[in-house]
Swiss-Prot record:
NCBIfam families: murA (TIGR01072), PRK09369.1 (NF006873). InterPro entries: Enolpyruvate_Tfrase_dom, Enolpyruvate_Tfrase_sf, MurA_subfamily, RNA3'P_cycl/enolpyr_Trfase_a/b, UDP_GlcNAc_COvinyl_MurA. The modification 2-(S-cysteinyl)pyruvic acid O-phosphothioketal is found at C117. This is UDP-N-acetylglucosamine 1-carboxyvinyltransferase.
C-alpha cells in the first residue's frame, strides 16, 4: 500500500496551478450519457475517481478517450448496457449519478449501491424518491438500485427535504429529457451544480435557476454534443491557501475563481491572513504570522463548505487561541482529529463539534488517512511538523487531488511517495 513520507518544518510559498474541480467533473462525465453526439471536455483533472468514472462509462458502451492531460473526448451514442457494476461502483459514491441519465434516456438503469468515503450515511434515498415522483419504478435487488419507466419521465414539482448536492444533480439530469417542466425546490446551490447545468444547456437542455434554491428544467426530446471546460476546483484552491497560512508562507493560486470561495476567504482574513484576488488568481500572504483561531460552522453553499472543514481544523490546531468547529453536513467527519492529536494537537470532540486549543508546533508521527479531505490535512500537518511524518492510506488523496506531491514540492515541501 502506498504512503507519503513528509519531512517537516517547511515554509510553503510560490505559485500553483489549480486543476479542474472533481466535484464538477464527475457529474458532468455521467451527464454525457444523455448526449446522442460526441462531447469534448477540457480542464478534466487526472484523478482516481475520474478514472473510475471512465471505466463505468466504458462498461456501458461509452467511448472515452483522454487525448492529453486535460482533454477528454466522449461518445455515448452507442450505449448498449445499462448496468453500473459493483466492482467499480463500490469505490465511489458518485457512481449513483449513472442512474438518472440512463433512466431518462433509455428508460432503464441499474447501479450497485455505491461506496467511497466513510463519512456518515450519505443515503441515496433522495435520489430515489425524486425519480419515483417523476414516474420511475424503483426496486432494490441484491445490492442494486434498479429503475425503469414506461415512456418518458414526467416533469413535476420536487421539494427536497434536505439540501443535497448529489440528489439535486441526479434530478436535474433526469429532468432534462422528461416530458414537461420539473421544478426542484430547496435545491443545492453549489458552483459545481451551476457548471453542470451550464454543460447540459450547451447540449440543448433548458435549465434555469441553477445556483439558486429553485431550479426549473423544461424537458427536451434529445441532447446533442458540445465542448465544455470544467470549472476550477475551489476546494483544492482553499487547501493551498491553508498551506500558506499554516506554514508562514505566501502562495498564489492560478486558474481559480474567488467568487466561489467567499466564505473561505472571509475566514482566512478573520484569521489574520492577507488575501488578494484578481479575476483568475487568489494570493494568500501569511506575513510570517501565526494564524488566529476562527470558529467554523459548515453549511450548504454559499455557507462554509464541509470539504474545507478538515483543513481549517488544522489551521486552528496551530492557531493562537481556542476555536469551535461545528459539522452540520456529514456524520463522522472528525476522524482526522485523533490523528492530529497524535502529532501534538490539543482538542476534544463533542458530538458534531470539535473544540480545538491552538498549539505552537506539531511533531511528526505515523498517521492514517480516513477520507479525502482528512488525508490532505494530515499531509499539510506533516509539512509543518518537526521531524518525519508518514501518512498511510493515501489512495484517499489520489481520489481528489491531482499530482499533489508534485504541486507541494513546487511550493517547497519535502514529500515522497513509497510502498510497503
Amino acid at each position: 500500500m502506498e504512503k507519503f513520507r513528509v519531512y517537516g518544518q517547511s515554509t510553503l510559498s510560490g505559485d500553483v496551478q489549480i486543476s479542474g474541480a472533481k466535484n464538477a467533473a464527475l457529474p458532468i462525465l455521467f451527464a454525457t450519457i444523455l448526449a446522442e453526439e460526441p462531447v469534448k471536455l477540457t480542464n478534466v483533472p487526472e484523478l482516481k475517481d475520474v478514472d473510475t468514472t471512465f471505466e463505468i462509462l466504458r462498461k456501458l458502451g461509452v467511448v472515452v478517450e483522454r487525448t492529453d492531460e486535460q482533454t477528454v473526448l466522449i461518445d455515448a451514442s452507442r450505449i448498449d448496457r445499462y448496468v453500473a457494476p459493483y466492482e467499480l461502483v463500490k469505490t465511489m459514491r458518485a457512481s449513483i449519478w449513472a442512474l438518472a441519465p440512463l433512466l431518462t434516456r433509455f428508460r432503464e438503469g441499474q447501479v450497485s449501491l455505491p461506496g467511497g468515503c466513510t463519512i456518515g450515511a450519505r443515503p441515496v434515498d433522495m435520489h430515489i424518491s425524486g425519480l419515483e415522483k417523476m414516474g420511475a419504478a424503483i426496486e432494490l435487488d441484491e445490492g442494486y438500485v434498479k429503475a425503469t419507466v414506461n415512456g418518458r419521465l414526467t416533469g413535476t414539482r420536487i421539494y427536497m427535504d434536505k439540501v443535497s448536492v448529489g440528489a439535486t444533480l441526479s434530478l436535474i439530469m433526469a429532468a432534462t429529457l422528461a416530458e414537461g417542466v420539473t421544478t426542484i425546490e430547496n435545491a443545492a446551490r453549489e458552483p459545481e451544480i451551476v457548471d453542470t447545468a451550464d454543460f447540459l444547456n450547451k447540449m440543448g437542455a433548458k435549465i434555469s435557476g441553477a445556483g439558486t434554491d429553485t431550479i426549473s428544467i423544461e424537458g427536451v426530446s434529445r441532447l446533442a454534443g458540445c465542448e465544455h471546460s470544467i470549472v476550477p476546483d475551489r476546494i483544492e484552491t482553499g487547501t493551498f491557501l491553508i498551506a500558506a497560512a499554516i506554514s508562514g508562507g505566501r502562495i498564489t493560486c492560478h486558474n481559480t475563481k474567488a467568487d466561489t470561495l467567499d466564505a473561505v476567504i472571509e475566514k482566512l482574513r478573520e484569521a489574520g491572513m492577507q488575501v488578494d484576488v484578481t479575476e483568475n488568481t487568489i494570493t494568500l500572504d501569511s506575513l510570517g504570522q501565526r494564524p488566529k483561531a476562527v470558529n467554523i460552522r459548515t453549511m450548504p453553499h454559499p455557507g462554509f463548505p464541509t470539504d474545507m472543514q478538515a483543513q481549517f481544523t488544522l489551521l486552528n490546531v496551530v492557531a493562537e487561541g481556542t476555536s469551535k468547529i461545528t459539522e452540520t453536513i456529514f456524520e463522522n467527519r472528525f476522524m482526522h482529529v485523533p490523528e492530529l492529536i497524535r502529532m501534538g494537537a490539543k482538542g476534544e470532540i463533542e458530538g458534531n463539534t470539535a473544540i480545538i486549543h491552538g498549539v505552537e508546533s506539531l511533531s511528526g508521527a505515523q498517521v492514517m488517512a480516513t477520507d479525502l479531505r482528512a488525508s490532505i490535512s494530515l499531509v499539510l500537518a506533516g509539512c509543518i511538523a518537526s521531524g518525519e511524518t508518514v501518512v498511510d492510506r493515501i489512495y484517499h488523496i489520489d481520489r481528489g487531488y491531482e499530482h499533489i506531491e508534485d504541486k507541494l514540492r513546487g511550493l517547497g515541501a519535502r514529500i515522497e511517495r513509497f510502498s510497503e
